[in-house]
UniProtKB/Swiss-Prot annotation:
One of its GO terms (molecular function) is pantetheine-phosphate adenylyltransferase activity. This is Phosphopantetheine adenylyltransferase. One of its GO terms (biological process) is coenzyme A biosynthetic process. The record marks H18 as: Transition state stabilizer. Keywords: ATP-binding, Coenzyme A biosynthesis, Cytoplasm, Magnesium, Nucleotide-binding, Nucleotidyltransferase, Transferase. Gene3D superfamilies: HUPs. Reversibly transfers an adenylyl group from ATP to 4'-phosphopantetheine, yielding dephospho-CoA (dPCoA) and pyrophosphate. The keyword Magnesium applies. Homohexamer. Its cofactor is Mg(2+). The gene is coaD. Belongs to the bacterial CoaD family.
Length: 169
């Protein structure tokens, strides 16, 4: 039986923090599926297609180098439903600090009640990526700041292009 893990998030954009989680997650499973949540009430900076492409280009080679199968999907329902759909028994969540832990523990408890076969695995962020959030990256990029220390090079380029084309709403 292969160990399938789901790593959910908005990935708007992919950050070095997300990449750190993936580098650790691929050691824990036979297949990692990154699931991009689609929330009707939110207007992401990058389209779903752009985020899928980013996730595949940035995370795919990391999984391949580790000998881990990789997949990417989207979902617009409960995260546990997305996990069940891909056959995942592991839910990967990254933690930056105690605030993340408190929130993620609540979610993990609810998920465990709804889907007892899916186990949440918390991966603490490496020291160098703990302060990074996608929200802060978007804000810095929107103000013309250099985000190259916080995101993979191709994501920094995509952010620069996105904001050079005119400030997204």
């Amino acid at each position: 039986m292969s160990r399938i893990a789901l790593y959910p998030g908005s990935f708007d954009p992919v950050t070095n923090g997300h990449l750190d989680v993936v580098r650790h997650a691929v050691a824990l499973c036979d297949k990692l599926v990154v699931a991009i949540g689609i929330h009707p009430g939110k207007k992401p900076l990058f389209t779903t297609e752009e985020r899928l492409a980013m996730v595949e280009r940035v995370f795919g080679p990391v999984a391949k180098a580790a000998g881990c199968d990789f997949g990417c999907t989207t979902y617009d329902n409960l995260t546990v439903t997305a996990a069940e759909k891909v056959g995942a028994t592991i839910m990967i969540r990254g933690l930056r600090d105690g605030t993340d832990l408190d929130y993620e523990m609540q979610i993990a408890g609810m998920n465990e009640t709804m889907a007892p076969a899916i186990h949440t695995v918390f991966l603490p962020a490496s020291v160098g990526v703990r302060p990074i959030t996608a929200t802060l990256v978007r804000q810095i990029a929107a103000m013309g700041g250099d985000v190259s220390a916080f995101v993979p090079a191709e994501v920094a380029s995509a952010l620069k292009s996105k904001f050079a084309a005119g400030s997204p709403a």
